[in-house]
Amino acid sequence: MGSYHDEKNVMGGSDQGELCSLAMTIASGSVPAMVLKALIELDVLELIKRAGPGAQLSPAQIVAQLPTKNPDAGTMLDRMLRLLASYEILSCSTQTLPDGRVERLYGLAPVCQFFTNNEDGATLGAIVQLSQEKLVVESWYHLKDAVLDGGIPFKKAQGMTIYEYPKTDPRFNQVFNSGMSNYSTIIMRDLLERYKGFEGISTLVDIAGGTGASINMVVSKYPTIKGINFDLPHVIKDAPSYDGVEHVGGDMFESVTKADAMLIKWTLCDWSDEHCLKLLKNCYNALPDNGKVIVCDYVLPMAPETSNAAKTVFLLDAIMLANFVGGKGRTKQEFEALARKVGFEGFEVPCSSYDFSVMELFKKKNN
């Protein structure tokens, strides 16, 4: 049995050839994500996972478990799977059959731990579904016009903002909430292992907390905390009930519920400086003198870098550009400037979780 990747250097060539290949890969950048989206919808990755650790299945074995009678399904699936194997999303090996044909077998590469359900039932597959959602993709077709004429691409495409639209479309509301909930769960699981700043808090408000998955995880680990999940009424109406968590509907730009501490996760990046200052001022006013705001957000490096982590935060910044009113990534210095302008005296960055930094904004500076 041979490895598919043993042959990966056969297509090598001159520097110009490599540059041309890179250009074609960039030009076709949406294809792997759309193929991955289809495989997730077909439940292919979960089928392979259920076969056991290290298992590899042939396209025929996978198709046998799909609700299809399409005679071409195996060939189509093979072509989709080998594309993702070339991106190291899947592993691939080959075996020669008795009739001389070569058959490819596919397994899950390490990155698939994020595209299949984890122990919390969370998966970045929900983010694949959201980012490749037709409504979201349509925003990119208006990016050029937004540069020339101003405005937000999503609003140009849909006639309203990405926060207004879910109220008119229950299906998209579910896709949006699912994406945010799954993403939050994955980040929060790691954050709770690294960040110790929840210790000693009596009451914690998760601002723009969605359906409450994150605050539930915090309260589950710190059961003495009274958790409050704060979000817009149309968001929390679908929120499940959690022990120790109260769902409160409201507008964070008008006021927020009083508590010892506030948690703001990947929310400031959605808004302009003006909106962020208004939100942070509401938090400041609702905190006791010894209170703090815990901000978990992506932090941009001062200059572009080529690491996967840097690419991720710049991709997120581009997503903000296309979909959110004034949304943008910020450097550490820009986050601190917002906090100081509102009146927070202390600013610390105790840790990071995946591509996000945890920042603490203290109302009064610790002595």
UniProtKB/Swiss-Prot annotation:
Annotated InterPro entries: COMT-like, O_MeTrfase_dom, Plant_O-MeTrfase_dimerisation, SAM-dependent_MTases_sf, WH-like_DNA-bd_sf, WH_DNA-bd_sf
Keyword terms of this UniProt record: Alkaloid metabolism, Methyltransferase, S-adenosyl-L-methionine, Transferase
Pathway linked to the protein: Aromatic compound metabolism; Alkaloid biosynthesis
Gene Ontology annotations of biological process type: methylation
Effect seen on changing residue 324 to A: Increased activity toward dopamine. Reduced activity toward dopamine
Enzyme class, broadest EC rank: transferase
Record: residues binding S-adenosyl-L-homocysteine: 184, 208, 231, 251, 265
Chain positions recorded as S-adenosyl-L-methionine binding sites: 231
Coiled coil: none
Keyword GTP-binding: no
Biotechnology: An heterologous biosynthetic pathway of mescaline is reconstructed in Nicotiana benthamiana plants and yeast cells expressing Lophophora williamsii genes TyDC2, CYP76AD131, OMT1 and OMT11, thus providing a sustainable production of phenylethylamine-derivated natural products.
EC code(s) of this entry: 2.1.1.27
GO MF terms, alphabetically ordered: O-methyltransferase activity; protein dimerization activity
Catalytic activity: tyramine + S-adenosyl-L-methionine = N-methyltyramine + S-adenosyl-L-homocysteine + H(+); N-methyltyramine + S-adenosyl-L-methionine = hordenine + S-adenosyl-L-homocysteine + H(+); dopamine + S-adenosyl-L-methionine = N-methyl-dopamine + S-adenosyl-L-homocysteine + H(+); N-methyl-dopamine + S-adenosyl-L-methionine = N,N-dimethyldopamine + S-adenosyl-L-homocysteine + H(+)
Task of the protein: N-methyltransferase participating in the biosynthesis of natural products derived from phenylethylamine, including mescaline, a natural hallucinogen potentially used in psychotherapeutic treatments.
Quaternary structure and partners: Homodimer.
Family, per entry: Belongs to the class I-like SAM-binding methyltransferase superfamily. Cation-independent O-methyltransferase family.
PANTHER family given in the database record: O-METHYLTRANSFERASE (PTHR11746)
Protein name, per record: Tyramine N-methyltransferase 1
Native source species: Lophophora williamsii
Upper taxonomic lineage: Eukaryota, Viridiplantae, Streptophyta, Embryophyta, Tracheophyta
